[in-house]
Amino acid sequence: MIRINQIKLPIDHKEAALEKKIKKALHNTEYKQYKIVKRSIDARKKEELSYVYAVDVTLGKGQEEKFLKKNKNRNIMAVKEKKFEFPENQREFKYPPVVNGMGPAGLFAALMLARDGLHPIVLERGKDVTNRMKDVEHFWESGELNPESNVQFGEGGAGTFSDGKLNTLVKDKFGRNRFVLETFVEHGAPEEILYENKPHIGTDLLRNVVAGIREEIRSLGGDVRFEAKVTDFVIQDGKLTGLIINDKEEIKTEAAILAPGHSARDTFKVLSDRDLEMNPKAFAIGLRVEHPREMIDHSQYGKGADQYDLPAASYKLTYHANNGRSVYSFCMCPGGFVVNASSEPERLTVNGMSNHDRAAKNSNSAIIASVTPEDFDGNDALAGVRFQQKWEEKAFSEGKGRIPVQTLKDFREGKITESFGEITPNTKGLTSFGNLRNCLPEPVSEAISEGMEYFDTKIKGFNREDTILCGIEARTSSPLRIERDQGFESNIKGIYPCGEGAGFAGGITSAAMDGIKVAQALVTV
């Protein structure tokens, strides 16, 4: 197979134009078929927006070697398709392996074990995605929180109520990244995620994909249980022998993949009490900022935003503040919503969420600043958790149980907003005016304020006074890391930490890939 990179075409090109470019690159050598492997928008020249393609081309028998011998184009090369293959099980298990958690890491770990014929028991503290959706909608409308069924807990994990981004910086020579995307497509995700430079599913489509994976696990003999919270771990002589479910039932097992998500603070506490080795780690905290989608689109695409049918524009911004903190955009949601993502009573955190069409009036992103264990009160494993809880409590209090919102102008002046400008919030969850400076450490507030000013040099209008701020974004990643060895096992034999909650991933795809890796370790001698 031959790959042709850097095929550039106008945004409004027809399919025939791509085929013509392929023929030209091949000097009219006959080819059987082509497959788009990557497509991105080049918006560096706003007056000349273009798509840039990479395609894989299959030539006729004997033609590939002949063509490559004569080829002098550095954008054309031979490639071999990487097809990930999960190994056959090599171990004997007295009891079925258990997967704790049904976010991307747990789902893919369970899927791999099920496809290997191991009939895993899959435990999720929250509800299935359909009933979870009802609880979340009720919370957004009424403010009544179900601590076990919310934006953080339930089938699909926190990513179910997000933008559904699938890009990752994790490199994997074995093809796990592609495998994850292909699995999503098998279960109903749009095929474009296989080649778009910044693939995303959207929360509306992701829910059905997650349910489809669950049903495959069940069809292969997996035992999937909802509202099954792991409340304790039975450990004898440094080895796991069982799990306690809902403080009642004991499930015997010698192998449990632990994928609880980054908000399973009660689980972290139990594990700490059981002497599982874990350490606090750096993360980031901040606010969600909202701008008009049209403003962001015009900034990124120029006049092309009006001329062409383009996806809602995204951005990625970074800044190093004078106080030494890194400030950056995180989990940018084009055409999306700011959602109340709380999971604990009297504590409040937010996140961003988009549907597949990304058609909402505002585009939002977290603007966050780094915090390290030096910022925490104490140096034990749960110090970062307590840090999050402290500021989430302040946010809950400031908003009187609702999402506290403020204009950028008033944030800088430290006063409560009385009325909005042209921009109004686009949220899922009730809102209230509040002073967000009371909800963040002062060095973080200062770094964010400074960063917003700098970001205006990259995106005109980013620093406008009526920019909406919503707070706080406290769950950007896990506040701790559960240590594991080269075999992916913790210091307690039989417990295999996994995914974002354990500190080994950031986002849907990397968490899913980590779930596959850990499942692979489990079945390999």
Residue map of PLM features:
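Residues forming the flavin
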Residues: 2-51, 55-525
